[in-house]
Amino acid sequence: MPRILAIDYGQKRTGIAITDEMQIIASGLTTIASETSIAFLRDYFTKEKVEKVLIGEPKQMNGEPSQSTDIIEKFVTKFKNNFPDMAIERVDERFTSKMAFQTMIDSGLKKKQRQNKALVDEISATIMLQDYLTRKI
């Protein structure tokens, strides 16, 4: 069964998570520089079967688009142009960064380790993907 990939796209960094082949468990894959995201994905898609890509949709508490929406929309357009046959689903990414930070605290990471923003982005993508899998059941 092909995998599902989640992208937490940001201005500087992009967190990426992937499911196992049974689409049961979400795991962090990596964090990359955002400007390299299309090249990274192109390479990844040649190595792994992916049936769908989830892309975080930043929203404010009231459901309105956040200030980073324009950046994400430009990425989505670029993604669609490069991978026209790939299924995309937009998912609400509110609170994922806070949940990622709390996960780091709960897992016992020291303060210096918790300041690793790349790790926060990867965990955020993983939380987004696991939430999607839970709702899919």
UniProtKB/Swiss-Prot annotation:
One of its GO terms (biological process) is rRNA 5'-end processing. GO terms for cellular component: cytosol. It is found in: Cytoplasm. InterPro entries: RNaseH-like_sf, YqgF, YqgF/RNaseH-like_dom, YqgF/RNaseH-like_dom_sf. Its EC number is 3.1.-.-. Keywords: Cytoplasm, Hydrolase, Nuclease, Ribosome biogenesis. The keyword Hydrolase applies. It is an enzyme of class 3 (hydrolase). CDD domains: YqgF. Pfam families: RuvX. GO terms for molecular function: nuclease activity. Disulfide bonds: none annotated. Coiled coil: none annotated. Its main location: cytoplasm. Could be a nuclease involved in processing of the 5'-end of pre-16S rRNA. Belongs to the YqgF nuclease family. This is Putative pre-16S rRNA nuclease.
